[in-house]
Structure formats: C-alpha cells, structure tokens
Amino acid sequence: MTKSELIETLAQQHAHVPVKDVENAVKEILEQMAGSLSSSDRIEIRGFGSFSLHYRAPRTGRNPKTGETVELDGKHVPHFKPGKELRDRVNESIA
C-alpha cells in the first residue's frame, strides 16, 4: 500500500472528513515520525510495533558495474520491529 492508497482508503472510510484533511493528517503523522527518528527518538505504537535506529558499521562494498571495491561509511538506518498483536494478526490471515 502506498501513501496515496492509504489516504484514499481512509477518505473512503471517513466520508465525512474532506480528502485534503485526511491527506494533511497522514502527512503530518509521517512527518512527526520522521522528525522523531532523526532526533534519535524511539517510536512505540502499542499493538503495532516500534521504530528505532540501528547503526550499520563501516564496511567494504563493491561497485556492481565495475567490480571495484568501495569503502562505505557507517550510518544509522531506520528499523521496524512489529509488535506481538501485529505478528499474530498477520500470521492468522496468511495461515
């Protein structure tokens, strides 16, 4: 599901709310989450999961076109850990 599909689905489920308001709400939620992560804050949504940053150490990579080795810097990457309720719900629907 893309962001625009999410906005469309929410707008259909809440027909009394203007689509522009739904779009602004979704964008604001995502912006707040991105801001929290960029400040190294952990985000926990009970029953859904948590977002945090994981550090990837520097490493030697390879350019796939030339085969040349390249030194890659260490960096922080967003990580999502699903909560138990989400894991259970997904497993029930797939099984």
Curated annotation (Swiss-Prot):
Which Cys-Cys disulfides exist here?
Answer: none
Q: Which UniProt keywords apply?
A: DNA recombination, DNA-binding, Transcription, Transcription regulation, Translation regulation
Q: Give the span(s) annotated as Disordered.
A: 56-95
Q: InterPro entries, per this entry?
A: Hist_DNA-bd (IPR000119), Histone-like_DNA-bd_CS (IPR020816), IHF-like_DNA-bd_dom_sf (IPR010992), IHF_beta (IPR005685)
- Cell membrane keyword on record: no
Q: Which GO terms describe its cellular component?
A: chromosome; cytosol
Bias category Basic and acidic residues: which stretches? 72-95
Sorted alphabetically, the Gene Ontology BP terms of this entry are: DNA recombination; regulation of DNA-templated transcription; regulation of translation
Query: What Gene3D superfamilies does UniProt report for this protein, alphabetically?
Result: IHF-like DNA-binding proteins
Task: Write out the GO MF terms.
Answer: DNA binding; structural constituent of chromatin
Q: Which residues cross the membrane?
A: none
Source domain of life is Bacteria
Spell out the PANTHER family in the cross-references: DNA-BINDING PROTEIN HU (PTHR33175), INTEGRATION HOST FACTOR SUBUNIT BETA (PTHR33175:SF5)
Q: What does this protein do?
A: This protein is one of the two subunits of integration host factor, a specific DNA-binding protein that functions in genetic recombination as well as in transcriptional and translational control.
The record describes its quaternary structure and partners as:
Heterodimer of an alpha and a beta chain.
| Family indicated by similarity | Belongs to the bacterial histone-like protein family.
Protein name (database record) = Integration host factor subunit beta
Q: Which gene encodes it?
A: ihfB
